[in-house]
From Swiss-Prot:
This is Protein YqiM. Induction: Expressed at low levels in exponential phase in rich medium (at protein level). The gene is yqiM. Pfam families: YqiM (PF23507).
Length: 27
C-alpha cells in the first residue's frame, strides 16, 4: 500500500513537471 501511494505521488508530481515544461510551448 505504501509502495502504491509513493508511486502514485511520484507519477503525479512528474505529470505536473511535464505540464509546467510544456506550458510555455502552448502559449
Amino acid at each position: 500500500m505504501l509502495m502504491y501511494q509513493t508511486r502514485r505521488t511520484y507519477q503525479n508530481s512528474n505529470n505536473i513537471a511535464v505540464v509546467h515544461l510544456l506550458k510555455p510551448a502552448w502559449r
